[in-house]
Each structure stands twice: as C-alpha cells, then as structure tokens.
Amino acid sequence: MGRYSRESDNVTKSCKARGPNLRVHFKNTHETAQAIKRMPLRRAQRFLKAVIDQKECVPFRRFNGGVGRCAQAKQWKTTQGRWPKKSAEFLLQLLRNAEANADCKGLDADRMVVHHIQVNRAQCLRRRTYRAHGRINPYMSSPCHVEVILTEKEEVVSKAVDDEPAKKKLSKKKLQRQKEKMLRSE
C-alpha cells in the first residue's frame, strides 16, 4: 500500500484510489484533475465522459502555453481549453476504482465528492529519435502519479428562521425625518 500526500479528515466516510506511473501526459492530466476537484462524483464522471466526446472542454490555466482558444472554456471563465481524451479516460478509470472502494466500505456513491486529487510527475521514460547527419536526440515521455480521495458529503443543517428579523438601528437624523413624514401625512 502506497502513501498518500494527504489523509482525509474522516477516514470512515472517505475512500482512496491511486495510479502510479501512468503513461499519460503530466500537464494534460494536471489540468483535467484541477477541473474535477471539489465536484460531486457523478458530475465528475459525466464531465470526463463529455470531455471524451468533446462536449465540454478542460480549461487550461497553468500549462497553457500555445493552447488554442475555444468557446466552451467560457463557462470556466477562461479562454483556453482542450479535450485531453487519454487523461480523461485514465481519470475516469481511477474514479471508477475509488467508487468501487466506496461500495466495498458501504458508503453511498451518490453523496461522494472529489475531496482531494493530486497529480505528480513520475520518472521520465527515455527513447531516441534519429536526426540528420548521424545525430540522435532524446524522445522523452512524461508519465505521472495520480491519487484521489473521495469523501461523503455531510448533510447541511439550516438555521432556525426567526419570526421577526432584527430591527435596524436608526440614527437620530433618520428618526427625526420619519417623525416629520408621519406629521405631514396626517
């Protein structure tokens, strides 16, 4: 069992999943993970499926050099976005794994929220490409480690409503004006 960078507040109401050394681009996966952070589990799964079908885009905020603009990014209050299909598929598989862990623990999957998701760089894999004049250049891949913690959302209890709202304190000047209005109307 690997270590997680963070432990959840309530261990009995949360579940974890991780994927080490995934052969998927780190930068794309980081942006996709930031998009689903703090989403309910069902919404995150719908979002990732929509990204695969190019119905919704992933906003690129940090690693956005050379990323084109798209109209779908407006809903995220940004201009740049892409549809990283492979990253979305890997994260969707990880969320399915975490959901299965939640079912095993007896938690309600419909009330789960993506509490923590983190993407770290893994060790680069080295290949080579052949260039002109007998030279060789590196052809590196940038895999990543991903970890997810889902937490069951607590029921929010609303405050009791008072019958009379607290009266606003009025200044002497305003009280004087109100008295004058009352006298004029009579």
From Swiss-Prot:
Keywords: Ribonucleoprotein, Ribosomal protein. One of its GO terms (cellular component) is cytosolic large ribosomal subunit. GO terms for biological process: cytoplasmic translation. Residues 161-186 are annotated as: Disordered. SUPFAM superfamilies: Ribosomal protein L22 (SSF54843). One of its GO terms (molecular function) is structural constituent of ribosome. The keyword Ribonucleoprotein applies. InterPro entries: Ribosomal_uL22, Ribosomal_uL22_CS, Ribosomal_uL22_euk/arc, Ribosomal_uL22_sf. Pfam families: Ribosomal_L22. Residues 177-186 have a biased composition (Basic and acidic residues). Belongs to the universal ribosomal protein uL22 family. This is Large ribosomal subunit protein uL22. The lineage of its organism: Eukaryota, Metazoa, Ecdysozoa, Arthropoda, Hexapoda. The gene is RpL17.
